[in-house]
């Protein structure tokens, strides 16, 4: 979205809609009809917990090994921390020689994994979004 210069994203509806809406439009919410969080709500919460309230376009970390089909977007948080959003349908590994410490977040699972290395970091790339945070 940074490449397309979007400023905002709008949600269609916060919660699922009742039978007054068409069948097609009843289940778009982040919450179900009883206001219980759906998995997408939890993933979005985890995503926003890591990204913070605002992001500026940034550069992804320097890499000397990347899997095929990698989607890679660099950001900088308001506090100056750098973020790398990435995934690849093929999966694989990414080697980041310029990093010695970082934290890897999986917003879908809600996990965070500290990473350290003396010759850079090797990160397993999955087909789902992951976020790497470093200074």
Enumerate the language-model features and the residues they cover.
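Solvent-exposed beta-hairpin/edge-strand motifs
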Residues: 98-112
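Aromatic/acidic polysaccharide-binding cleft in carbohydrate-active enzymes
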Residues: 1-45, 49, 58-67
């Amino acid at each position: 979205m940074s490449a397309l210069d979007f400023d905002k994203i709008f949600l269609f509806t916060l919660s699922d809609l009742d039978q007054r809406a068409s069948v097609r439009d009843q289940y778009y919410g982040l919450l179900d009809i009883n206001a219980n969080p759906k998995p997408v709500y939890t993933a979005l919460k985890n995503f926003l917990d890591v990204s913070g309230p605002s992001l500026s376009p940034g550069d992804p970390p320097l890499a000397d090994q990347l899997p095929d089909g990698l989607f890679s977007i660099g950001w900088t948080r308001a506090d100056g921390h750098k973020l790398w959003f990435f995934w690849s349908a093929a999966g694989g590994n990414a080697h980041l020689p310029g990093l010695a410490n970082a934290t890897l977040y999986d917003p879908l699972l809600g996990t965070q994994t500290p990473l350290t290395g003396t010759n850079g970091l090797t990160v397993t790339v999955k087909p789902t979004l992951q976020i790497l945070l470093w200074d």
